[in-house]
Amino acid sequence: MGGGSALSLAVCLVLAVLAPAVSGDGATLESVPDLVKAMYLNIESFPCVRLLNLSGEIGCSNPGSEKIIAPIVRLTKGSDQLVQPSTVLLPSDQMSDFFLRVSNDPEFHQKVSGVLIESNGANNNLQELSPDGKFPQDAFAPYSNRSHNWNPAGSGIMWNRYDFPVFLLSEESTRVLQKVSEKNKKTDNGYKANVAEFDLVMQTTKAQTHDSASCLKERSCLPLGGHSVWASLPPIKNGSTEHQKPIVLAITSQDSASFFRDRSIGSDSPISGLIALLTAVDALSHIHDLRNLKKQLVFAVFNGEAWGYLGSRKFLQELDKGADSVNGINSLMIDQVVEIGSVGKAVIEKYPSFYVHAAGNSSASNKILDALQSASKSLGSDNVKVKQAASSNPGVPPSSLMSFIRKNMSTSGVVLEDFDSHFSNRFYHSYLDNPAAAALVARSLYILASANSVVDLMTLNTIKVNVSLVEELIGCLLTCKPGLSCGLVKSFISPSSTSCPSHYVGVFLDDPSGTQFPSYADDTSRFVWNFLADKTSTLAGNKSSCTGKCGDEGEVCVGAEVEGGGRCVVSTTRYVPAYSTRVKFEDNAWHVLPANSSDPMGVVDPVWTESYWNTIGLRVYAVQDSTFDWLILLAGLSITAASYCAVHVGRAYISKVVKRD
């Protein structure tokens, strides 16, 4: 009894010593969860994860299967040194220089246990930041000159492998960690330090599968992919001969490459093209004589373009196969291709200027340029300029159009961009804050669909862009508030995430056979499908609500996810799987296919995959120096020994007194 009391007394004394150090703010600890909450601070952050291809790995991971724990040190200059293995807190403007140093300085690399990148917040003072290469995805270019610097600011750091965890902090977490690092600096060589604990253990690391072929075989990864969407305006009938018109195909991308999985640092520029296309479709949907045009308008939004042009290549493969996902169109019907690239930066100038990058110098491509210039003139006082890109360029810039050209070198197409020879957006963070691009695209498509017939100028001048829609799409797709919780998105779908929009393609989770009713499609793809289905539709005869399939052929259910159900409309809008043409889903698993010499883009396809993981976590807490721990232990043992002696002496004294009595 006496020994147990002594031990309890010792524990109480030790807790009394430690409690103030743990809580830090004098808060009352009433339970074990309170104690844990006071000791450990979970940090809101966005990870860089492990990606694999046929030749190896890129991205980030813990080096083994254990958590990483290291003190937090803030570096403000690229030349700063580390005296011990540390968690590096880094301003975002130092990111490129830091990772280049890590790759080139093995001694410095050994002292980097983990990296935390500060959020820039609203005060974006970055001069340039592009983790991509100087010629993104140059292996897919349909020309031999791969030395052209389309992206002069490109550092290429996102294509390297890092055997330490890297996280991007939220704005609030950035402020917290800056204070923590200051405390560490002030108590340098003291008995207490604040450390970061990283849980970024990748399944491919544990399974020792270090390329896409082996990890797919061992099922420690999944292929990158998602769903593209296409729609026709007006709707076309399956198997009918009346719609066999040449197709004017307007395309854009919905994804972008980023160093971090769930948050893009300055890589949203392709989304300006998506916003322009959606707004152009809305403008054209109000025209009533579209069935009388000589050509059929078709719109396609490709997913996975930043990772080997997954969406556009799979779309073309589906056309070749005559798959259900492209029922109603075929590749021979595609007459002209107009791609809307990054168009957000053009509006910075007083008079927006757009550059037309043509595939070759064919008469058909020149007709697209003529249509764009005619549309520009029709806008009158809006002063939108359309210029032909420099003839010194090696060809079209990195774009989905490359897939079409590599498939058919005689493809007539152009890419509309806000730059001439080099990306104008040095830190990849452009927003479309002017309806000029959407108006230009909408009118150009109308002119192209009119073919050689006389354009109805009265109708052309009625094609106007809804400025409020542009602003709403920016808020939904490019900002955190409201983000995908905006009213427009929620009128069509029930978003699975209320956090900031992510433009990372993700992994392909479905069995690809169920394309038109996928069990999983990301929020952006589902929104785009519903938006296009709505804007390109005519009302169905049956106006009852729906929650999935509609009864009549040619009908689709728009807004099926919203409360109260959706509505059936007549629309030709379909999902198309977007994943590598070099992988196949068979026997409930993914397999890498051998390269086919007839598919030049497939030959150079890296076949990107993403590792599985169990949990991803980042938390911060204070730890004592080991010397202090030994002192605490010694103090505890001393107290225990003293208590034992006191009890022993006390017992002897009491026994002696009792005997006297």
Task: Pin down the residues of each PLM region.
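Secretory-pathway/membrane protein signature
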Residues: 1-661
